[in-house]
């Protein structure tokens, strides 16, 4: 479960920002998770709760913003929706795809005191 390591890194970033920006508590965390990122949203939710326990973000709401997958098809020169990395282009059936969205995992926003 790599989500635990991802959440540990996320908490480290949040704690560093708390020191740098002088906030005492995190009320909410919004995280963008791409459909092609190989990250399970519910596993992230569980792991964040476990890792944040007893810290600055212990009582924070954990909000997940889903980002749809998209790719540039080199065969038909179009940006197309992509549900999974191994899928062909839905327009031409080609496999020469460059992912342009949906592979991210990012802390989008923090609500702090």
Curated annotation (Swiss-Prot):
One of its GO terms (molecular function) is nickel cation binding. The gene is hypA. NCBIfam families: hypA, PRK12380.1. This is Hydrogenase maturation factor HypA. Keywords: Metal-binding, Nickel, Zinc. It comes from the Bacteria. Belongs to the HypA/HybF family. Disulfide bonds: none annotated. Ni(2+) binds at residue 2. Zn(2+) binds at residues 73, 76, 89, 92. One of its GO terms (biological process) is protein modification process. Involved in the maturation of [NiFe] hydrogenases. Required for nickel insertion into the metal center of the hydrogenase.
């Amino acid at each position: 479960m790599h989500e635990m390591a991802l959440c540990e890194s996320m908490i480290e970033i949040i704690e560093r920002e708390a020191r740098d920006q002088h906030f005492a508590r995190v009320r909410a965390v919004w995280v963008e998770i791409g459909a092609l990122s190989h990250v399970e949203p519910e596993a992230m939710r569980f792991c964040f709760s476990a890792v944040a326990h007893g810290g600055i973000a212990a009582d924070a709401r954990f909000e997940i913003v889903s980002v749809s997958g998209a790719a540039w098809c080199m065969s038909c020169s179009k940006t197309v929706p992509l549900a999974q990395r191994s899928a062909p282009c839905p327009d031409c059936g080609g496999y020469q795809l460059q992912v342009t969205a949906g592979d991210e995992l990012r802390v989008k926003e923090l609500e702090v005191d």
